[in-house]
Regions:
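Alpha-helical interface subdomain recognition
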Residues: 4, 8-158
Length: 158
């Protein structure tokens, strides 16, 4: 009994909060990765020419870049909401916000990463560009601390 840290039977609650703080940390990293992917893709589309003009002038690609921007902004908004809920006090509302944030970064990270790679063409996954690195990192972050199914169930149970 002298070796017990904290109160007996409270281990899971402490662990759950620690995991949620970890989600906030890697989730914030994911938002930064998405922002970098979006900005590098926009810049690349301004420079890369096809058929005598920058590919960023093609409407279809403009729409994709807007969709990338919106996915990033949705993730960033949920990040701020989850951080505010944590700041108000850790409890069910903070847990719900964190689970919603985790689901969103998984969805948005995949979308932004795949589109960044595709719009960069074959260069997207080479070691010369950071695009592939950020996409791989987003893929790993999606698997950390529970996938979308886990967090959707958790959200519903709260």
């Amino acid at each position: 009994a002298d070796s017990v840290i904290g109160e007996g039977g409270q281990g899971y609650a402490v662990l759950e909060r620690t995991i949620d703080e970890g989600i906030m940390a890697v989730g914030s990293e994911a938002v930064g990765c998405m922002e970098k992917l979006y900005k590098e893709t926009v810049e690349y589309c301004r420079q890369r020419e096809q058929f005598g003009q920058a590919i960023g002038k093609f409407q279809v690609l403009q729409h994709r870049m807007v969709d990338m921007f919106m996915e990033h902004e949705q993730s960033k908004s949920l990040m701020f909401m989850a951080a505010m809920r944590m700041d108000e006090g850790y409890g069910p509302e903070a847990q719900k916000a964190i689970s919603a944030f985790k689901v969103q970064i998984g969805k948005s990270g995949k979308f932004v990463g795949q589109n960044a790679v595709q719009l960069h063409g074959g260069m997207g996954m080479t070691e010369e560009l950071s695009i592939g690195h950020y996409f791989k990192r987003l893929t790993i972050i999606d698997t950390l601390f529970g996938n979308a199914d886990f967090h959707l169930k958790r959200f519903g149970a709260l």
